[in-house]
Amino acid sequence: MLLAMRLLDFLFAIRPLVLVPAWSFFLLGAAAAPDDSSRTWLRLALFTLAMIGVYLVNQIVDLESDRINDKGFFLQRGIFTPRQYAGAAVASLALALGVAAATENAPGLLAVAVGLGLAYSVPPVRLAARAGLDLGANAAGYGLLAPWLGAGAGTSAPGTAFLASTTLAVAAVFMHTTLLDLEGDRRTGKRTIGLVLGPGRSRALAALLAVLAAIAAIASADRDLGVAAGVLAVGSAAAAFRPARVSSRSVCVGGTAVYALAAAAAWPLFAAAVLALALATRIYYARRFGMRYPAL
């Protein structure tokens, strides 16, 4: 029973719901430029392993800011130690990159994604604490590299307009993400784009980025992408002009949801998987910590 609880704790310690945006953009890229299905699913598994490693490193570095922002549960409560996280991260990254190289399944692009993810978190580079570079790193990681990996990193990569739209969309949502973490970032010395611009200008920039994402999606002629980008543009504009009615959290949750639905339009089982994961997460956090998570 104790071992089962430890395994369950670790499953949720990697924050599986945080993987949903990465999966969504990966699958959108896979749908836009189909590759051999067996290689696509293997690449998704390797991408997931790599992102788990990156997220574990991020949690180690952000231990204190997550505590302040009330986002930490496992390191902060002593359920796991930073050393255990580090060991798991090394194993995940080594396995992902090793198998990608052995199977010649986009190893170079996966390595770039891992390098960017680590540069985002790890000092002295730590792009997460550098205003502007934090935005660029997130947009490039989720909006550019994830769909490109989904397509297989080959000559069948999604078109320029498609990748421009996904990159701009991620940037728009990220602007609101930084607003949710202002207090913790300020107290731990992180100089994020949200802190530098402030809430008003951050919301305005997010709206502009979302509108540009919608324009690029229309140019890409991808219907599902266009619908998702259009919804994000409307939500972002509403948050900019009526922030009291449309919160940054609503934009983050809604933006994640519409792109997950766009991915599910091409991969229907993805919707069922995300719903099952959300339900399992809600039950786990209620029973383990007595709290409501995820909360809308």
List the model feature ranges, each with a label.
Residues 1-296:
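Multi-pass alpha-helical membrane architecture of UbiA-family
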